[in-house]
UniProtKB/Swiss-Prot annotation:
It comes from Heliobacterium modesticaldum (strain ATCC 51547 / Ice1). This is DNA-directed RNA polymerase subunit beta'. GO terms for biological process: DNA-templated transcription. Mg(2+) binds at residues 449, 451, 453. The gene is rpoC. Belongs to the RNA polymerase beta' chain family. CDD domains: RNAP_beta'_C, RNAP_beta'_N. Gene3D superfamilies: 1.10.132.30, 1.10.150.390, 1.10.1790.20, 1.10.40.90, 2.40.40.20, 2.40.50.100, RNA polymerase II, clamp domain (4.10.860.120), RNA polymerase Rpb1, domain 3 (1.10.274.100). SMART domains: RPOLA_N. DNA-dependent RNA polymerase catalyzes the transcription of DNA into RNA using the four ribonucleoside triphosphates as substrates.
Length: 1180
């Protein structure tokens, strides 16, 4: 077997007949499989032991040699080599064909490679291969043309007329002859010449032919190898035959397909020996060709061969294709040992880095470790007795188990694993019962709840795996979310309501304005029930409190005249778990504030302090939410008094609008729009009235206001009015639901509201699948983006400013700058302080300040130039400076970080939260702009969007002209040229007469076609557009994603250029090539004094970009497996194994993190060796 770690590239190509014979261990001559009586393989059959090796370890077929001592002997009676039976997984056989057959991939694939080489249409080729027509091989001195097709009758006529002066044939033999005599060099020269002379369709055809010819010429594959004389037979263990209980046999479909090939082949041999008539032989040859086609790719041509029950048989191609194929099922999705799964329950007393592991489960998972320890400690004499002890569960076993699991982390995973936080490491704590216990703070990351969710446990075995789990995957180290750098382990639900109740201030409570000498005294008074938890009190600051106040926000420092702190007992208790350096919290704490506290703590004090603080907040939160005893009853839902008046007003307004409509003063469309506006305003009015009337201590209000559960919209439906609903098509019904759930809905109102509810459920189901598929494509396109060096040395970057949509700020400038490297020095004009230095990271406070200065217009320009992944020059992957900060750690990104995968997960994971719907908000018909998930997909796939906007292609002044009742636009450029744009009837203009526009400005509403944007505004224009649009969709749904993740994707979409003129290089016109390769080719040409090639950048959708990758393994395991492999084989492609996927497929360590060669090729030197090495270095 080959050693996986010993090679660094992998090549694929066409196998010549001689090579196949060389691989083979013997020829399969009979279609038999196994003998039905003895159940032993038949000799020379598909399972023959002589060819493929023995079925039992160290035992020959006839039984003359048994035992390992005869290893390597070939039995003289049965010819079987005595060896391990697992050779039956690797030994190939072969079938010698009586007549050559074509390989269906190369004849039937699109484009047909054989057809392009021979310059024949696939239809004519099919006629020849399947014995319908003759093809002229040598025309001699006859008027026939070479490669001309002749029907049976034409062939006979010409035979009678010219005798043997010409040669024609049919079937794969004829094609093979034509392929053998091809001169690729000559053909290549002719085609390159032809390219210079022809245009249009003929040029396209010539380019495609040249591609195939060049591929054969450069790869060393011969064209005639596309026709097979020998067929390899895959090892029998890969197409097994097993006996079922009833004595019947289940067999792999491949055996059936091979059997048909062998039967037909043997029959053909017999017919040829007998000298049968031509027509019978031809028919048999055609059947052989069809049998081989079915074996290689069943169903590609004609009707698929079916097995029992009309099920199409699975051919070799089907074994590789799709989710159940070899690539995705076995190579990328392996099963693991040492794992278990169980239901999860909450473990509120666990620490952040712990999980509760059921005892019986732990014993089974750590069995080998326990057995080893039992022997070491002398409880058992040998492994066998230790095993018996464990199986009988003796008392000593539990003590040993405790020792074994100490310091041994386990991994917990919840499906679906949408991002890397879906697998985290914990230290196990043994618990009774059979359920896993989960710390409540990691639920957000797992998206877990306790309504019956299950989780899987995995045990990292090797020391390296344990170190990795502990240092990188421990839950306490994953407090920040990689997608936006915000804390993901923030308290939720009960903990939030507890903290909220603890820190809220109640006026007129018992003990108000009492004065205490220290926080401890205040807390003692609360314990003695002399002061209420939420009463406002005054406290003299102690040393710890003083320190906390120094770090606190200015609002928190409210003192009375004597310098005593004004606060509440609850806040003192809350601050007892907050480290002083985070600052004293003197405000009402809801979910948002908790998030900020965690972020601040992580920033200032690091991981261990934050984890301890989180556990403190968790404990307090649970304690006080229990003490508060917050409950919800129907009386807590109070309907505001003003509701009746507001609704009556709205009804009268609507009546007026209806009257205007009936008199014909307004159109149906205007009526609809007005009614909807009236009801939207009324709904808002009722909601505001509701919020005014609700008491600050109303449990429903407290829940929503603190962020523990629910929101204003839901309270509105409970106690305000439900408002407008949409019908099944998404159009808003202009009859609102005036009632709320407290009052109860009428039958009609209930019916109207069911549309929305049902659509919501259907949407969710569809969305999950779509989002998953989008994530898969994103991962595939970016999986080889790894941080490979510190600095790529580029001086380019991108300008960034706040992303604005109309009046609404979608993404603040400070969010876009934090943690990125600046390309220019920025100095504060007021203080002269340096806010950003060239090639250094911009910190959060500096980013905020730059944002302020730009808003006040105090900096020279509005955009800040930063280093970006989009302009990074690293060949495979990105560099540290262009990427900037790793959001999951808050520090600069490490070399070896797989930032592509992180980006894909960060964009894909929130995908399920995006809505599906296309909004039809009244307005103009046909103006439905796609939004939500479909819009993200449309952008990443670079599709032409629905509802196209027309964009200006020049800079100039807009003139709006009337053209037969519709508005058209003319743009007058600075040199006086006028350009006309026809505007469709139902489009709305976005520009005004006399406005100055730049190229790329949208003239009408809608979405821009990104390919037009690339043409008009160039690479940077389209990159900014895609980034802005994707951000818009996510931010409008309230999902924050950092720019850099989207940049990684956009960069992968823009990796290729299309060659226009090849100049004197070897590039093919119209070919796609990586920018870096293109530049290298041109550099070579210029150095040699030749003419360089020209090319234009193109934008590929993520699916296309994944398939256009350098790695054929990655592309084949993604989609269109057969097409990718066909092309790769003809080109003799070499896979450089740089991405993660390829290495997982072949079983190598992935080249990320410590798997990178720079971390692995390290020599450890000791003592004197170091001095010697230094001397050598000095001499070198």
């Amino acid at each position: 077997m080959l050693d996986v770690n010993n090679f660094d590239r992998m090549r694929i190509g066409l196998a010549s007949p001689d090579l196949i014979r060389q691989w083979s261990s013997g020829e399969v001559k009979k279609p038999e499989t196994i003998n039905y009586r003895t159940l032993k393989p038949e000799r020379d059959g598909l399972f023959c032991e002589r060819i493929f090796g023995p079925t039992r370890d160290w035992e020959c077929h006839c039984g003359k040699y048994k035992r390992v001592r005869y290893k390597g002997i070939v039995c003289d009676r049965c010819g079987v080599e005595v060896t391990r039976s697992k050779v039956r997984r690797e030994r190939l056989g072969h079938i010698e064909l009586a007549a050559p057959v074509s390989h269906i991939w190369y004849f039937k694939g699109i484009p047909s490679r054989m057809g392009l080489l021979l310059d024949m249409s696939p239809r004519s080729l099919e006629k020849v291969l399947y014995f319908v027509a003759y093809i002229v091989i040598e025309q001699g001195d006859t008027p026939l043309m070479k490669k001309q097709l002749l029907t049976e009758t034409e062939y006979r006529e010409h035979r009678e007329k010219y005798g043997n002066r010409f040669r024609a044939g049919m079937g794969a033999e004829a094609i093979k002859e034509l392929l053998v005599e091809m001169d690729l060099e000559q053909l290549c020269r002719e085609l390159r010449q032809e390219l210079k002379e022809v245009t249009g369709q003929r040029k396209v055809r010539a380019i495609r032919r040249l591609e195939v010819v060049e591929a054969f010429k450069n790869s060393g594959n011969r064209p005639e190898w596309m026709i097979m004389d020998v067929i390899p037979v895959i090892p029998p263990e890969l197409r097994p035959m097993v006996q079922l209980d009833g004595g019947r046999f289940a067999t792999s479909d491949l055996n059936d397909l091979y059997r048909r090939v062998i039967n037909r082949n043997n029959r053909l041999k017999r017919l040829l020996d007998l000298g049968a008539p031509d027509i019978i032989v031809r028919n048999e040859k055609r059947m052989l060709q069809e049998a081989v086609d079915a074996l290689i790719d069943n169903g590609r041509r004609g009707r698929p061969v079916t097995g029992p029950g009309n099920r199409p048989l699975k051919s070799l191609s089907d074994m590789l294709k799709g989710k159940q194929g070899r690539f995705r099922q076995n190579l990328l999705g392996k099963r693991v040992d040492y794992s278990g799964r169980s239901v999860i329950v909450v473990g509120p007393e666990l620490k952040l880095h712990q999980c509760g592991l059921p005892k019986e489960m732990a014993l089974e998972l750590f069995k080998p470790f326990v057995m080893k320890k039992l022997v070491e400690d002398g409880h058992a004499h040998n492994i066998k007795s230790a095993k018996r002890m464990v199986e009988r569960v003796k008392n000593e076993v539990w003590d040993v188990l405790e020792d074994v699991i100490a310091e041994h982390p386990v991994l917990l995973n919840r499906a679906p694993t949408l991002h890397r936080l879906g697998i985290q490491a914990f230290e196990p704590v043994l618990v009774e019962g059979r359920a896993l216990q989960i710390h409540p703070l990691v639920c957000t990351a797992y998206n877990a709840d306790f309504d019956g969710d299950q989780m899987a446990v995995h045990v990292p075995l090797s020391a390296e795996a344990q170190a990795e789990a502990r240092n990188l995957m421990l839950s306490a180290h994953n407090i920040l979310n990689p997608k936006d750098g915000r804390p993901v382990a923030t308290p939720t639900q009960d903990m939030v309501i507890g903290s909220y109740y603890l820190t809220i201030e109640r006026e007129g409570a018992k003990g108000e304005n009492m004065i205490f000498a220290s926080p401890d005294e205040a807390i003692a008074a609360y314990d003695a029930k002399s002061v209420h938890l939420q009463a406002r009190i005054r406290v003299r600051p102690t040393a710890r409190l003083q320190e906390a106040l120094e770090f606190a926000k200015s609002e928190a420092r409210s003192f009375d005249e004597q310098g005593r702190l004004m606060t509440t007992v609850g806040r003192l208790i809350f601050n007892s778990v907050i480290p002083p350096k985070v600052g004293y919290v003197n405000e009402v704490v809801g979910k948002k504030q908790l998030g900020n506290i965690v972020a601040r703590c992580y920033d200032k004090l690091g991981i261990s302090e934050t984890a301890a603080m989180l556990d403190g907040i968790k404990k307090l939160g649970y304690t006080f939410s229990t003490r508060a005893g917050i409950t919800v009853g129907i009386t807590d839902v109070e309907v505001p008094e003003e509701k009746r008046r507001l609704i009556a007003e709205a009804d009268s307004f609507v009546e007026k609008v209806e009257q205007q409509y009936r008199r014909g003063l307004i159109t149906e469309e205007e009526r609809y729009q007005k009614v909807i506006d009236i009801w939207n305003k009324t709904t808002d009015g009722v909601t505001q009235a509701l919020m005014r009337t609700l008491d600050k201590f109303n449990p429903v209000y407290m829940m929503a206001n603190s962020g523990a559960r629910g929101n204003i919209q839901q309270i509105r439906q409970l106690a305000g009015m439900r408002g407008l609903m949409a019908d099944p098509s998404g159009r808003i019904i202009d009859l609102p639901i005036k009632a709320n759930f407290r009052e109860g809905l009428t039958v009609l109102e209930y019916f109207i509201s069911t549309h929305g509810a049902r659509k919501g459920l259907a949407d969710t189901a569809l969305r999950t699948a779509d989002s998953g598929y989008l994530t898969r494509r994103l991962v595939d396109v970016s999986q080889d983006v790894i941080v490979r060096e510190i600095d790529c040395g580029t001086h380019e970057g991108i300008p960034v400013e706040a992303i604005v949509d109309g009046k609404q700020v979608i993404e603040k400038l400070s969010d876009r700058l934090t943690g990125r490297y600046a390309l220019e020095e920025i100095v504060d004009p007021e203080t002269g302080e340096k806010l950003a230095a060239y090639n250094e990271e911009i910190q959060a406070d500096a980013a905020e300040r730059i944002d302020q200065l730009i808003k006040q217009g105090k900096l020279a320009h509005n955009a800040v130039y930063i280093r970006s992944v989009l302009t990074c020059r690293t060949r495979y992957g990105v560099c540290r400076r262009c990427y900037g900060r790793n959001l999951a750690t808050g520090r600069s990104v490490e070399i070896g970080e797989a930032v592509g995968i992180i980006a894909a997960q960060s964009i894909g994971e929130p995908g399920t939260q995006l809505t599906m719907r296309t909004f039809h908000t009244g307005g103009v018909a046909g103006d439905d702009i796609t939004q939500g998930l479909p819009r993200v997909e449309e952008l990443f796939e670079a599709r032409k969007p629905k509802g196209l906007a027309i964009i200006a292609e020049q800079d100039g002044i807009v003139r709006i002209v009337d053209n037969k009742g519709r508005k058209d636009i003319e743009i007058v450029t600075d040199d006086g040229e006028s350009h006309h744009y026809a505007i469709p009837y139902n489009s709305r203009l976005k520009v005004e007469d006399g406005q100055r526009v730049q190229a790329g400005t949208e003239l009408t509403e809608g979405s821009v076609n990104p390919h037009d944007m690339l043409r008009v505004k160039g690479i940077q224009g389209v990159q900014t557009y895609l980034l802005r649009e994707v951000q818009r969709v996510y931010r409008l749904q309230g999902v924050d994603i950092n720019d850099k993740h989207i940049e990684v994707m956009v960069r992968q979409m823009m990796r290729k250029v299309k060659v226009e003129e090849p100049g004197d290089t070897d590039l093919l016109p119209g070919g796609l090539i990586d920018i870096a390769d293109f530049e290298a080719e041109n550099l070579k040409a210029i150095e040699a004094g030749l003419e360089p090639a020209t090319a234009r950048p193109i934008l590929l959708g993520i699916t296309k970009a994944s398939l256009a990758t350098d790695s054929f393994l990655s592309a084949a395991s993604f989609q269109e497996t057969t097409r990718v492999l066909t092309e790769a084989a003809i080109k003799g492609k070499v896979d450089p194994l740089l991405g993660l996927k390829e290495n997982v497929i072949i079983g190598k360590l992935i080249p990320a993190g410590t798997g990178m060669s720079r971390y692995r090729n390290i020599q450890v030197l000791v003592g004197d060796e170091i001095d010697e090495a230094r001397l050598e270095d000095g001499m070198a």
